[in-house]
């Protein structure tokens, strides 16, 4: 991460909080996919860096390539937030899913592995600062429940 904040993040499994699920449709009712939230190690006094990836067009159990991605970077406890404000600045090059648990019919948990990059910065919503997340890769947990938020919209 470079810009208003210069950091090299190298978080390990036990240090991270990770959860994910279906991404709600966007304004055009077409931008679905998954949302993955990854919180880094506790930095004391309620401070933690959290990255939220909104990956468009990903369906339950299916791999993806070149998926447009919205990225939000939160500095919890510091009142700082950066966002790409759309999925046109970052891309997930490759995403794989492996079912790890079935909780009930139409309710499953997947291990998701993703790798990608950003060509444009995330901007602070209040101060005009910018940061560029040059590249990222992560593995996390995504839970799909008995709903259709992750399914592609029906064609008219």
Task: Name these PLM-found stretches.
Residues 1-88:
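An ectodomain-focused feature that recognizes extracytoplasmic/extracellular
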Residues 29-31, 125, 151:
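Amphipathic, positively biased hydrophobic alpha-helical segments used for protein targeting
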Residues 62-142:
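Acidic, glycine-rich flexible loop segments
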Residues 10, 121-123, 147:
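Residue-level recognition of conserved structural "scaffold" positions that shape functional pockets
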Residues 137-156:
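Short, low-complexity, Pro/Ser/Thr/Gly-rich segments in the mature regions of secreted, periplasmic
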